Amino acid sequence: MAAKAIQYNIKVDLHEVKDLSFREAAGEKEIVPNPYIEVTVNGVTKTTIQKTQVVSATFNTSFNFTAYLTPDEFARSYVEVAVLHKYMLIGGVGLQSAVIGKYVFSFAYVYTKSQHWIYRQWVTLRNLDQPQDETGLLLITVGVFGPGDAMPVVDETVCVVNEGERTSTDVNVKLTHYSLSVNIFKGQDIPSVAGQFSTVLEPYVKVKHGGAELQTRPLPDSNPDWLASISIPACVPCFDGNVLVELWNGQDSSTAAGTLMGTVVLDYFQLIKNDLPPRWFNFYWRPPAEGLLGAVTDMMASAELREPIAYGGRILLSASAAKVQTPLPLGVRSARPIPDPATQECVWWLDLYEMTSATGYTSELRIEIAFGPHVIKTASLEANALGTYVIGDNLGRLPEMKIFAPVDEVQVWDVMMYVCSPPATTVAAGIADISNWFSGWGGSPTATQNTPEPAETPWTRLAWVRIPYDSRQFQNGKPQWYSLRSLDGSGTDMFSVLLGMEMFPTKAGKQRAPRLEYKLARFYFRALIYEGLHLPAVGYDVFPDPYIQVELASKTLRTSTIRQTLNPSYYEAYEIEIRLPENISLAPDINVEVISESNSLLSSDVVLGSVQYPIQKVPKEWTKAPVWLQLHSKAYPRCKARVLVAFELVPAEKAEDDTYPFYDDIRPSTKEGNIRLFLVGVRLFKPITQPFVTVCFGRDVENTAEPLWSQESSAPRTGEGGNWNFLEEFTVSVSLPKRMQHHSFLEVKIQDRTQGIGGESNVDVGMAYITLNPLLPWLDSRERAESLETFRLQMLEEVLIEDAENARRSADGGLAARTGGGSFDEDATKKKEMLAAERSRKMAIPYNDPDMANLKIEEVDDYVSFKVAPRPQASRLSREGTSRDERGKAPGKSLSGMPGPVARASPGAGEETEKKGDPVAEKKEGGAQAAPPVAPSAHQREALAASPEEETYGFTPEQLNFVLADLEEDDAEEMTRDEVPYELEADFTVDDLPYLRTPIFRPTDAGVPETVGYLKYVCRVFQSTDEDEGAEMDAVCKSLIETYNSTRDLVVRAYVLAARGLVPPSGASDIQTYVWIQDSENAATLPGGLSYNIRDTGYTKKQGFKPEFNRCYTLACSLPENSIVQIAVMNMGRLTDECIGRTYLDVEDRFFNKKVEQMVIEESTPIELRTLKNEGSTVSHGSLRGFFEIMRADYAQLHPPYTLASAEPDEYQLRVVIWRVKAVPLDDNSSISLFVRTIYQLEDSSEIVKDTDTHYNSTDGTAVYNWRMVFDVLIPAQIPVLKLQIWNYALLSSTEPIGEANFDLTADFFRARKRQQHYRVPRMWVRCSHPAHKGKLRGTIEIEASILPREEAEYTPVGNGRDEPNRDPFLPAVTTNRTYIDWQQIGETVGAASSAIMSGLKWTGVWMTVAGIIALVIFVMFLLK
């Protein structure tokens, strides 16, 4: 069956581009581009902002896409990323764009990766029109996530450059070039396509890989000879593992679109290892419906109606990937003809024995069997008196067919078998013939030789099955039953055919064996139907009305219908006489279907699931326990439904003489049991007004919609919204099964009384099942544990997560198989690098890293140590200054108020933790010191916690002659806080709570129910009514009532740190997020400032899909009214706000959980990751990171909330000093004029551009500036990168950059913000590069910087350039090379020339010159007189 379309979320994070190289055509000069990035997924394109005249740029932009794809569509889908150049006019007016380079990620390849994503990967951009050029690098993250896949959250500090590496190092992505060649030789048997106005036959082949798409020319022939070789430049590493070969018929036009006949997916990495020799690829398709109405029907068809059902031809192709030094150009070339793959003459024998109909079809039928282009048809078949089509020797033994088939088994066609009904014209003609015969007009007309035979009218195909070719199966000739599925898209199996096939080479000389004797004998078939379990629902809030139908050899048995349940109990036995082959191995298997009965004339029954039981396993007498059979549902593949059944098959004579008697009473043996149910309450995700609960057991035999016993609760004692406490006990004595195989349970219906126009009405809210099997006292512990797992109802969320884990395991297995034979997968290396970076992580931590959001980073030299010193105890700050032990004690009670002492974790005796390593910090180049040892792992932290004496490396203040500032206690606390990558509830066990809980669910159209709340209860089953047996339960119930009476004044603290991987349902990319947290709809503020509902719209974060909140929300809480805390991440819109995702936190469970209570006391509540979900969506919409506490109000008053680092940006001033430039190449010029440009991008994507003055006419590539630049910045910053560029100032020609570098200030910003004081970036040289001169130094810039809080900067201002105030540091004036015309140099040149002239003259010439000058003076004086 064709799978349904599945929702996928695609995340693309664009981090950075580097070394862009753009030229309009090959051989032309490179130009500095104006880059921007386009990302296209499934026809949807999203674009980043444009940068101006840069070859490297930081984007830090995220895009989300949502797609609904079938597996075939998923295999063909990809993410296409294109970096483009925007042509600009003077004044910033944009013109057309040109491609700089592209990259493609196929969905299938990304999904095979761990966690279904590729994280921060440098890829080489390529322009396939100029494959020899490497047009730049792109740092990108791509993820493809399906149902149940969690959004990955990583420690981003691993991937951030460390101190001493502020400028991004050269990225060396070494490409190995390949020439991918796909040779398309010819096609055969390609059918024409019936269009709306004409029939189209223009087949061609299209090849796609790595963003390239080429095709052969279309040829109007069903057997075209293309002889085309498609060449695509390819490389490794590559993230498009697919080479798609598509067979199309008809070109796209204004009136019609081309028809995709089929797709072949070649493995690119396998082609690198081994060439694909010429071979046939067979295509199968579903012919489109004819006419305009048919076209519309095809567009709206379900996946079932798009599944291929017919042979669509084949193509002969070969493929290879040859390593080359330089990539070859893209193109389609001629290919030499080659001989066809080897074939052999084969003999095909077919024997049909019987056909049965599961739908009671008894009209005239015919069977057609197609083997590629070869088709064989039976004569028309008539049903016998038993309603089956027994095919005798004359019609069943089909004539021998000789076929030339490929020797290679994988190239042989599959077998397609159809059941067809006669066309209407044939039926009418048959009626006319019968009428003529009766009226005397009949007779056999004599056909003349000149009368042409009329063309056969095709019969209508009703059902089909595709049988993959298997030489072992096709050579044994053993008959098998095949189920044929309906062609109407319903997915039901209409017919079953017993067919024997045999195929072997003619040269084998094998003689056809006699046809198996097919005689029917009488049997009595008995079906024992017990129960159904976890059947799928038939829609939202619609329970099924299931009955079970058993079919064998066209005989059908049907049980009664049990109304409105997922767990029906039947206990019905049926016996029927049936005729089966004497050779029982030829009999069909038993088909069991569970069907929901329709209640309307306008709808039909719905098949919930089916299973086949082998007839050969059925005994004459079933003596063992009945078996649970797993149902397979085509409409509900995620539902794990089962049926409990048994079967017997007795020869007629053995049944009729009572050798094997039939018993119709199959009810299980029982024991009397007393059920006590203490209903604590209901916890719903949505509010209701007047809830009540009905507890039911069993079903009435006469009216299965009514329970055998039921009792309605009284009004709830306390509660509001969706949380209500009943604290009421229900007692009933019933008969319960002895054996664990039979399911025994209570049904609990939750309803709400509402007032409407018509009066009072009851609205169904949800249903809960309480399984009694684990509570039965006569079962042993193993049976209880097994029955608990067997009868546990899986919710939609659990099923999705389990499916995702299975897919991950399969993907990991496939990945291991793929990487086992080659070295093209870089995951292993990348993981090693990330682990190594994690182990050696230094203190250069980004400000926006959630793991380090509340840490204070001190200078490394503060931790230099030469001996081991005792580590001080860290605890939360207390306003009263009480000790940790004092604060851990609540007056008379624990935090939850339950009786008993507060549990304390005693240190393990005799356990010591040794810390090994060199305590002396090593010096690095540039004066930077090595980082302190990395933080211990979770396992190490446990060992440290259990150690009686904790040790750390560092001086004690007494050992120093100065004051050592220790870490703040708040920060030290956060450093030791554990983190779990899941929701904390996953660690809760049944024994952690004083009550049990089961999901309250509602049916969904996926078949699997979804959770709408929880039912909390205490339940016991007793064999007697002895009061001593119930003493334990009485004590538990009494304790719960007392505790709830004292839980009116509680406090919930929700520390919401950050959100990651947000996926807005609207697909918006520019989002402003805030937190909405509530445990009640009541938004009023209580005395003392607490509230039940906080919509934090005044604290919006415009940080994209990774906002930092670092907010502590304190909510008032009373149990049970406020048991469920809803935390939603909202996107603030212009008109309405959008809920991105929400998570529900059951604080009541945490209040009663002793382990969680101890965590609060010990201040060790771990940070957890909670999945954000949205109603109507089955995929994750992101993750919320935080930790959560619940406590009594008096305890909260003694223990203030933790102080979290603010996530609001602070105003700072960045002061950058450009000292000098050196090593700038002259590029064949005698001199060069240089200036330095700095670019800083603000939050609104605008840029601050500042230039130094110009150093003119440098003859050695050096320049001096002593120039200060001042930037007002916000920390945290979205892009904390300062771009440095060296420019050539040209008076006549255009000014252009010589080299550039990105100066990453992430770690410096983080440190400056943590210190809240003046922070200096040491003086250093920054190397510059240019993509047009790969691997060459294009100059270095000597730079120094400092970062100050805005208040301090205003107190100690400095001037730009060398303006006053000129301080910190003082910048000396520069006077040389500051004018374009150097007059001093000109004077020196003239003087030198004069000296040269004078030294060459003789004394005679000198005296003559002097005399001439004197005569000239006298002449001037004479004139003046």
Curated annotation (Swiss-Prot):
The chain crosses the membrane at residues 1404-1424. It is found in: Golgi apparatus, trans-Golgi network membrane; Endosome membrane; Cytoplasm. The record marks D541, D545, D605 as: Putative Ca(2+)-binding residue. Residues 877-889, 912-926 have a biased composition (Basic and acidic residues). The keyword Membrane applies. GO terms for biological process: plasma membrane organization; regulated exocytosis; vesicle fusion to plasma membrane. Coiled coil: none annotated. It is a single-pass membrane protein. InterPro entries: C2_dom (IPR000008), C2_domain_sf (IPR035892), C2E_Ferlin (IPR037724), FerIin_dom (IPR012968), Ferlin (IPR037721). Disruption phenotype: Attempts to generate conditional knockouts failed. CDD domains: C2 (cd00030), C2E_Ferlin (cd04037). GO terms for cellular component: endosome membrane; trans-Golgi network membrane. It comes from the Eukaryota. Residues 1-123, 161-281, 506-629, 1032-1160, 1192-1319 form the C2 domain. Keywords: Cytoplasm, Endosome, Exocytosis, Golgi apparatus, Membrane, Repeat, Transmembrane, Transmembrane helix. Belongs to the ferlin family. Plays a role in microneme replenishment, probably at the vesicular trafficking level. Directs microneme organelle traffic differentially based on microneme population. Regulates microneme secretion: facilitates microneme membrane fusion with the plasma membrane. This is Ferlin 1.
